[in-house]
């Protein structure tokens, strides 16, 4: 087999990209290798200092902890060097002389957040607090406290030249923060906060992707947590995020979390900052120190570091404030220890235990405080609570199962609608854009379900089933229906909306010669599938990107989009007006004595009502139920407005069914379509010949005589003009014969010219 030059170049490029990609640690140059080694060495040195530290020792050469709050009061321009002249490193007290917190913040933590009432041994707190907590956050002060100088080591800086191999020495002090909005300050007075709590019980090795269960020696007393904290003003114009590790004191319900970056190695500060009280300080210090050391050894902390850790730490140091977070949980004194254990076992492994999960109280933060030592910002929390993660997963699973039932109902309704319009003439009356809008929503839902299945492993099975059901509905049934609609209307593509809406007192000229175009459903299907997937990708990316927009812009986009996507009956109303469907009384009159099934309304009322209800239920749930799983705000007024809008569309469809599809338009606004029922002239008989009887012609389908109405011959005026049909190509057939023929083909049986639908 010969390989041309282009193929060879392509193979070489692919092999180059494959073999030149960074390894498991992300290092792609000697400079980055030295950066990573410097970072690992720095952490190893500081860990050795941490291991030798006792409760009575102060912090020594640990990044971000070299200066106390009192040091900054003494000299606001003090550099973070070690050792500081005259500073005693062999003593430790929980005050501003040794901590990065001012005394009034320490006092607030001791009296308002971690008060002594929580030391009562009778208090019981849940050992598992995995959840998402939502609440309010208030600014206490952003200009009262002195800012502690926290330099960033220069070896974190990216290389400025490809020839560089050695990262620079020294540290960088930011005299003025980069002007990137409000990243280094909090300017709003009141806002909203979301705290995602997860236990560090299942850790993953960054190199070999092995997961191992991390269980510390005092697992019943202490827990290591991962915290993701996001807070912003109500309009979401100013957003802040914190990703940090935390220590959870199960006996006292206290949580301490400290952010970490290249300017603040907070992991080594957890033991000292957890021991605030006068009683058991040293014991708490030793327990937390042992917990941190176990985590360090279990994860091979420095060995698994990658260049991503270097870049993330550097970006966090440049663009974010460091925060210390102190939280106090509400006790669950209504339960015993055995009951709490039973609840945890049932949530982790549901077996039907008598745990009464429906009355399980939320994880409630009764008091909380956030303080930033390098930005001098103090924040307070209130009304922060949330349900257990397992309960939330159970609730979402029920919602997904209900959604699957809705998809099944929608598939059933669509199949009945397809059976109702099982002829080309009936399909021709369906609006292509009506079902395109419905199809776009269903296809996007399928894509979002597939994305969510990879993000939430606990819901993988119901999400995949939902995605599969929605994908079948969108890509098989709805696309197949759209292909039939498009194929039946392909000969109308030259008839634009402007032409249809122009004023015309005449009849639309169906007699002009047109090419006999036979639609190929294979090519139409390929075109529609390509368009479907393209629109699906664009629309899905638009929806996902909108979640990160400011709230006001996001709400405007959301409301407009929902309104447009719930206007799916408008194209069908327009299509009905274009096709000129007669009123119900006229349809009943014309059906007497003949097969006039083609005059039926194109949409079944069961399909219209059922589809409207099915597609309205999710919107009603999200906008009216304040505890919805999407954490969406409540807006009953919008639901009422949307319901009235849908009711208006259905009312117009019903009025078209009763009064005729053009009742609201002036006469002759839209040209009349071709009429198959018309008298013939004497010239027609002379040109096309007659049948075996006088004043008749032969029906090419049944080969029988067709009596016809001839204008010039009065004795033929007794013939019912609806008993025969005249095609645009001037061929005459029995009405029943041609209607049955047009159930399968919209082509003349004689000359194969395209026929306008009934």
Curated annotation (Swiss-Prot):
Q: Name one GO cellular component term.
A: fungal-type vacuole
Q: Which residues form the signal peptide?
A: 1-26
EC numbers for this chain? 2.3.2.27
A Gene Ontology molecular function term for this protein is: ubiquitin-protein transferase activity
Q: How does it sit in the membrane?
A: Multi-pass membrane protein
Metabolic or biological pathway: Protein modification; protein ubiquitination
Tell me if Protein transport is a UniProt keyword of this record. no
Residue ranges covered by zinc fingers (RING-type): 699-752
Q: Which residues lie on this side of the membrane: Cytoplasmic?
A: 420-431, 480-523, 575-602, 657-758
The residue spans the entry assigns to the Lumenal side of the membrane are as follows 27-398, 453-458, 545-553, 624-635
Which portions of this protein are annotated as coiled-coil regions? none
> What processes does the entry annotate via GO biological process terms?
proteasome-mediated ubiquitin-dependent protein catabolic process; protein ubiquitination; ubiquitin-dependent protein catabolic process; ubiquitin-dependent protein catabolic process via the multivesicular body sorting pathway
Concerning Pfam families, the annotation shows: DUF2921, zf-rbx1
Q: Which domain of life is it from?
A: Eukaryota
Q: Which reaction does it catalyse?
A: S-ubiquitinyl-[E2 ubiquitin-conjugating enzyme]-L-cysteine + [acceptor protein]-L-lysine = [E2 ubiquitin-conjugating enzyme]-L-cysteine + N(6)-ubiquitinyl-[acceptor protein]-L-lysine
Cite the entry's keywords alphabetically.
Golgi apparatus, Membrane, Metal-binding, Signal, Transferase, Transmembrane, Transmembrane helix, Ubl conjugation pathway, Zinc, Zinc-finger
InterPro entries tied to this protein: DUF2921, HRD1_E3_ubiq-ligases, Znf_RING, Znf_RING/FYVE/PHD, Znf_RING_H2
**PROSITE patterns registered for this protein in UniProt:** ZF_RING_2
Localization per Swiss-Prot or TrEMBL: Golgi apparatus membrane
Q: What does this protein do?
A: Catalytic component of the DSC E3 ubiquitin ligase complexes that tag proteins present in Golgi, endosome and vacuole membranes and function in protein homeostasis under non-stress conditions and support a role in protein quality control. Mediates ubiquitination of vacuolar proteins such as CPS1, PPN1, PEP12 and other proteins containing exposed hydrophilic residues within their transmembrane domains, leading to their sorting into internal vesicles in late endosomes. Targets also the unpalmitoylated endosomal SNARE TLG1 to the MVB pathway.
Q: Please give the subunit comment from the record.
A: Component of the DSC E3 ligase complexes composed of at least TUL1, DSC2, DSC3, UBX3, CDC48 as well as VLD1 for the vacuole-localized complex or GLD1 for the Golgi/endosome-localized complex. Interacts with UBC4.
Please give the name of this protein.
Transmembrane E3 ubiquitin-protein ligase 1
* Organism listed in the record: Saccharomyces cerevisiae (strain ATCC 204508 / S288c)
Q: What is the lineage of its organism?
A: Eukaryota, Fungi, Dikarya, Ascomycota, Saccharomycotina
Q: Which gene encodes it?
A: TUL1
């Amino acid at each position: 087999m010969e390989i041309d030059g282009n193929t060879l170049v392509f193979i070489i490029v692919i092999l180059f990209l494959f073999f030149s990609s960074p390894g498991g640690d992300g290092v792609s140059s000697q400079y980055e290798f030295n950066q990573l080694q410097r970072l690992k060495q720095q952490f190893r040195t500081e860990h050795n200092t941490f291991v030798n530290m006792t409760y009575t020792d102060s912090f020594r050469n640990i990044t971000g902890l070299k200066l106390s709050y009192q040091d900054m009061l003494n000299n606001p321009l003090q550099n973070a060097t070690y050792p500081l002249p005259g500073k005693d490193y062999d003593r430790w007290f929980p005050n501003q002389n040794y901590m990065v917190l001012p005394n009034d913040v320490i006092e607030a933590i001791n009296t308002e957040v971690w008060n002594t009432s929580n030391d009562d041994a009778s208090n019981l707190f849940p050992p598992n607090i995995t959840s998402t907590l939502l609440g309010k956050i208030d600014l206490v002060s952003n200009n009262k406290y002195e800012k502690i100088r926290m330099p960033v080591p220069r070896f974190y800086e990216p290389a400025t030249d490809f020839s560089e191999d050695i990262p620079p020495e020294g540290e960088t002090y930011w005299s003025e923060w980069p002007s990137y909005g409000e990243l280094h300050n909090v300017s709003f007075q009141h806002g909203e906060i979301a705290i995602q709590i997860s236990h560090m019980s299942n850790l993953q090795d960054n190199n070999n992707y092995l997961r191992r269960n991390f269980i510390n020696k005092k697992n019943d007393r202490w827990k290591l947590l991962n915290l993701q904290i996001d807070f912003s003003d109500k309009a979401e114009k100013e957003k802040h995020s914190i990703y940090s590790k935390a220590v959870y004191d199960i006996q006292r319900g206290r949580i301490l979390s400290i952010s970490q970056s290249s300017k603040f190695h907070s992991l080594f500060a957890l033991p000292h900052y957890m021991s605030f009280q006068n009683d058991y300080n040293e014991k708490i210090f030793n327990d937390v120190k042992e917990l941190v050391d176990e985590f360090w050894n279990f994860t091979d902390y420095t060995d698994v570091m990658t260049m991503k850790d270097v870049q993330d730490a550097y970006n966090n140091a440049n663009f974010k404030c460091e925060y210390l977070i102190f939280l106090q949980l509400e006790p669950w004194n209504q339960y015993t220890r055995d009951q709490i254990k039973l609840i945890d076992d049932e949530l982790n492994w549901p077996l039907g235990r008598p745990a009464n999960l429906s009355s399980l109280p939320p994880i409630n933060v009764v008091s909380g405080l956030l303080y930033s030592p390098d930005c001098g910002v103090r924040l307070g929390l209130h009304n922060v609570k949330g349900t257990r993660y397992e309960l939330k997963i159970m609730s979402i699973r029920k919602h997904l199962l209900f959604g699957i039932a809705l998809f099944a109902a929608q598939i059933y309704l669509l199949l009945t609608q397809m059976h109702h319009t099982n002829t080309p003439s009936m399909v021709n009356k369906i609006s292509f854009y009506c079902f395109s809008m419905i199809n776009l929503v269903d296809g996007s839902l399928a894509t979002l379900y597939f994305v969510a299945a990879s993000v939430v492993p606990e819901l993988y099975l119901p999400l995949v089933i939902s995605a599969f059901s929605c994908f079948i509905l969108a890509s098989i049934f709805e696309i197949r229906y759209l292909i039939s609609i498009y194929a039946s209307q392909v000969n109308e593509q030259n008839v634009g909306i402007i032409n249809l809406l122009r004023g015309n007192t005449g009849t639309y000229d169906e007699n002009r010669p047109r090419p006999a175009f036979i639609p190929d459903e294979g090519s139409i299907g390929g075109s529609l599938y390509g368009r479907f997937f393209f629109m699906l990708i664009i629309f899905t990316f638009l929806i996902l990107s909108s979640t990160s927009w400011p709230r006001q812009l996001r709400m405007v986009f959301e409301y407009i989009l929902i309104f447009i996507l719930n206007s799916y009956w408008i194209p069908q109303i327009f299509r009905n007006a274009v096709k000129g469907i007669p009123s119900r009384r006229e349809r009943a009159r014309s059906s007497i004595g003949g097969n006039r099934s083609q005059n039926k309304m194109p949409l079944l009322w069961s399909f219209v009502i059922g589809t409207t209800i099915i597609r309205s239920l999710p919107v009603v749930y999200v906008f009216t139920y304040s505890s919805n799983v999407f954490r969406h705000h409540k807006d009953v007024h919008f639901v009422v407005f949307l319901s009235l809008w849908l009711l208006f569309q259905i009312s117009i469809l019903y009025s078209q069914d009763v009064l005729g599809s053009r009742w609201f338009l002036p006469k002759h606004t839209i040209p009349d379509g071709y009429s198959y029922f018309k008298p013939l002239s004497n010239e027609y008989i002379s040109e096309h010949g007659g049948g075996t009887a006088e004043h008749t012609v032969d029906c090419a389908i049944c080969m029988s005589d067709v009596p016809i109405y001839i204008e010039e011959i009065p004795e033929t005026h007794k013939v019912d003009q609806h008993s025969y049909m005249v095609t645009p190509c001037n061929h005459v057939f029995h009405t029943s014969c041609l209607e049955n023929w047009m159930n399968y083909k919209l082509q003349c049986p004689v000359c194969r010219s395209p026929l306008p639908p009934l």
